[in-house]
Amino acid sequence: MLRSDAVTKGIQRSPNRAMLRAVGFGDEDFGKPILGIANGYSTITPCNVGLNDLSRRAEEAARQAGGMPQMFGTITVSDGISMGTEGMKYSLVSREVIADAIETACNGQSMDGVLAVGGCDKNMPGAMLAMARMNIPAVFVYGGTIKPGKLGGCDLTVVSAFEAVGQLTSGNIDEDQLTAVEKNACPGAGSCGGMFTANTMSAAIETMGLSLPYSSTMAAEDEEKADNAARSAEVLLDAVKANIRPLDLLTNDAFENAISVIMAVGGSTNAVLHLLAIARTAGVSLSIDDFERIRQRVPVICDLKPSGRYVTVDLHNAGGIPQVMRLLLDAGLLHGDCRTVEGKSLREVLADVPSVPPADQDVIRPLSNPLYGKGHLAILKGNLASEGSVAKISGVKTPVLTGPARVFESEEDCLAAILDQRIKAGDVVVVRNEGPVGGPGMREMLAPTSAIVGQGLGDRVALITDGRFSGGTYGLVVGHVAPEAAVGGTIGLVQGGDSITVDADQLLLQLNVDEAELTRRRAAWSKPEPRYRTGILGKYARLVSSSSRGAVTDQPD
């Protein structure tokens, strides 16, 4: 029995069938599985501009395989284009909108399965949230990574353009050089090319078995990506017939595998937020402390941007995520019994993958010679973050700094100070009231952090925030500080000049002010007025949970 029988079977469903006939159903089609294709196509961003072609390939393959595809649209927000503006407040919000849209369309139309096609950062976790909520057979198709831009023999990504702004203000390049970077950074379709958030989350989904092997590192414009979309539709139909559902795959071990791979490839801080959200929706007991536990045993073995040398297409050519997983599996750092949407175990999927990385590349290193001996996403706690915070310490020579606080109530004020060269070596920059409630929406601080790196201060200035960081960020940065300022977190009590210690070695984020003074400040603190009362941002601020629990809106704290 199919779920779609609810709208296709029986005399009383004659009106329903009448409408389905108008969109292409014939007599022979009413017993076929109805497969939703959640198409994230948009000309808003290069990440999604190629998704319509992929969705059409999947649609045709589904029909040829014996299913009845029904395509519908989802939205996207371009993180790169909205970065540094008020529009970035809508980025994390769009994750919930995408999840709600997919859930609404699939459940409203009694679909038997769904193929989600996405590109930009929030498309991936948004689709995964919907899949976990509905628990109908599902496959995710990643739109693919952009190829690197080229300038002067160097690979460029969009982060190169953000960093060039800081280089310009510090006098290291001129406006013509900045313009040259701008014109060459993004050469075509695809998601941002380093191991930034989109590529991190697609790697996580591949690891957890809800997308096909090698698919997360394919280039958007290569033919193999279109072939992958078609094959994914065939696999979805098989999953419907075999009744393989997302919650069969999204186990505690699968989340641990995803975290291990994210550490190994040097992935984005946003993976912490998104995996916590997906796990919570899937009913899996995952906490922020699990990331630290796994970090302690999984090294970084991939030399990828933003802090490394290579881009995601280089990782693909070196063997992709399966090669990374095989190394981890052989070292006992991966659960090989986890199932995939193809019905195979992860160990079976990796059986033919070489046990050592190719000798003619240095993108993927052996575990005996890692880039970093431990994972790069450290969970810091202390009186500034009693619920935890996430530090990205890749590319940092010494992840320890004690210095005076430079406090800003918004990203814009912080960026202005950096570009005016008012931030000096040794400073601890605090950007607050940018959390899930306070922002609302947890804006990403790529513009300030890139400007700091561009000015040569990446190792000598720390930036902490209750907001987020782009996957393109690196340096001594600490985000997701919880509790956030807007709900009374200690970050809201920091005053300019206070001493703050950021110590990733000791996993400490500490405001060096005595408890009596903090008690006095807390008594004088009052909850700030909401920045938005109506519209989606007002609604989001009222519903959203703490970042330490994934910042979800359908399961209040």
Curated annotation (Swiss-Prot):
Residues that coordinate or bind [2Fe-2S] cluster: C47, C120, C192
InterPro entries (UniProt xref): DHAD_IlvD/Edd, Dihydro-acid_dehy_C, DihydroxyA_deHydtase, DiOHA_6PGluconate_deHydtase_CS, ILV_EDD_C, ILV_EDD_N, IlvD/EDD_N
EC numbers: 4.2.1.9
Cofactor(s) demanded: [2Fe-2S] cluster; Mg(2+)
Cofactor note: Binds 1 [2Fe-2S] cluster per subunit. This cluster acts as a Lewis acid cofactor.
Known pathway: Amino-acid biosynthesis; L-isoleucine biosynthesis; L-isoleucine from 2-oxobutanoate: step 3/4; Amino-acid biosynthesis; L-valine biosynthesis; L-valine from pyruvate: step 3/4
Domain of life: Bacteria
Keyword Transcription regulation: no
GO biological process: isoleucine biosynthetic process; L-valine biosynthetic process
Active site: S470
The reaction(s) this protein catalyses: (2R)-2,3-dihydroxy-3-methylbutanoate = 3-methyl-2-oxobutanoate + H2O; (2R,3R)-2,3-dihydroxy-3-methylpentanoate = (S)-3-methyl-2-oxopentanoate + H2O
UniProt keyword list: 2Fe-2S, Amino-acid biosynthesis, Branched-chain amino acid biosynthesis, Iron, Iron-sulfur, Lyase, Magnesium, Metal-binding
Keyword Mitochondrion: no
Residues reported in the UniProt entry to bind Mg(2+): D79, D121, K122, E444
Residues with PTM N6-carboxylysine: K122
UniProt GO MF annotations: 2 iron, 2 sulfur cluster binding; dihydroxy-acid dehydratase activity; magnesium ion binding
PROSITE patterns membership: ILVD_EDD_1 (PS00886), ILVD_EDD_2 (PS00887)
Function: Functions in the biosynthesis of branched-chain amino acids. Catalyzes the dehydration of (2R,3R)-2,3-dihydroxy-3-methylpentanoate (2,3-dihydroxy-3-methylvalerate) into 2-oxo-3-methylpentanoate (2-oxo-3-methylvalerate) and of (2R)-2,3-dihydroxy-3-methylbutanoate (2,3-dihydroxyisovalerate) into 2-oxo-3-methylbutanoate (2-oxoisovalerate), the penultimate precursor to L-isoleucine and L-valine, respectively.
UniProt subunit comment: Homodimer.
Family, as annotated: Belongs to the IlvD/Edd family.
Protein known as: Dihydroxy-acid dehydratase
Gene: ilvD
